[in-house]
Amino acid sequence: MKKRILAIVFAAAMVLSTAACSSSTSNSGSTTDTKETTDTTDGTTYKIGISQFAEHGSLDNCREGFIQGLAEEGIVEGENLEIVYQNAQADTGTAGQIADSFISSGVDMICGIATPAALSAYNAAMKTDIPVIFTAITDPVMAGLANEDGTPVGNVTGTSDKLPVEAQLEMIRKILPDAKTIGILYTTSEVNSESAIKEYEALAGKYGFELETVGISTIADIPLAMDNIVTKVDCISNLTDNTVVQGLATEISKATAAGVPVFGSEIEQVKNGCLATVGLDYVSLGVQTGKMAAKVLKGEAKASEMNYETISECGLYLNTAVADKLGVTVDDEYASTAVEVFDTIAEQ
């Protein structure tokens, strides 16, 4: 059941877009895709460098949506757009190298997917006139990519994937009425996770929860961290944390063995074994970002004058196969409000 409940909040105008090409190569720590393009009738073509911080479903969906959003505005890969795609494989140093390579190759725009990629792109492009469009950033202000009022700090704008923490807490309380402690696994170096945890800490008591947080540095830390946390909590709630999401299969395997439900932060995680989320659709987030980028590429707006945007309403997504596996009963009336219900668990 696919009812979309996505209402887009425009903090200002709309933003950015640039180009793409494609033949495939890979570097150490990164992957690169390029594709040949052809000119449009008026001869205008664009070249966009896409830097994605890590390889997992949420960010992949964001990239797919970004390209789709550009196409909906007439900037089509293989026609008037060349896309150069590279993946930093969750390495900040590699993200910096990718950004520098985009600047050297003379792209018209850089799209940074996730906070470390966007920050690297912004720093690399700071002394140029190349606009940077970001997406999948939980807190652009804390990341230093936007001012407190949402205005850009430079030639940079985009979209935020801010987790609706209060709605998530309310959902957990409805599904697990007797739960007392929520566990959160997070990467200590990700500012987006720090921001989300502060909000959880501020709101958890309102819904009768205590928090148990465990920090990790790399994906290799997840097994031990999970062994530790599952003995102390009634459930786990994921953040939009790139390292944790990369290790989702391990997280869910450990939690399921302990009979502990995991609540996701977006749709893809629910498809892959999380019980539920009040989260966003990353394809839709990417589409909105692509439309912003198109405005910038066409000269209809300037990234430096556009506030970043968010998706204001997120929907309930539920996996009944996970509920059955864990013996969790979800109230029928509440389940009927879901945007989408999955009855299988996707293979990871």
Can you name each region flagged by the protein language model?
Residues D42, D139-T181, L280-A301:
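Hydrophobic alpha-helical segments within soluble ligand-binding/sensing domains
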Residues K295-Q348:
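Hinge/cleft segment of the Venus flytrap/periplasmic-binding protein
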Residues Y46-E73, V84-G93, S189-S193, N242-Q246:
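Extracytoplasmic "Venus flytrap"
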Residues K2-S24:
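Sec-dependent N-terminal signal peptides of Gram-positive bacterial secreted proteins and lipoproteins
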Residues V84-N147, D241-F263:
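Beta-alpha junction/loop-to-helix N-cap segments that form part of ligand/metal-binding clefts
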Residues I48, F66, T157-A204, N307-A323:
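An alpha-beta-alpha
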Residues V191-E266:
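Pocket-lining segment of extracytoplasmic ligand-binding domains
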Residues A19-T38:
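Bacterial lipoprotein signal-peptidase II cleavage site
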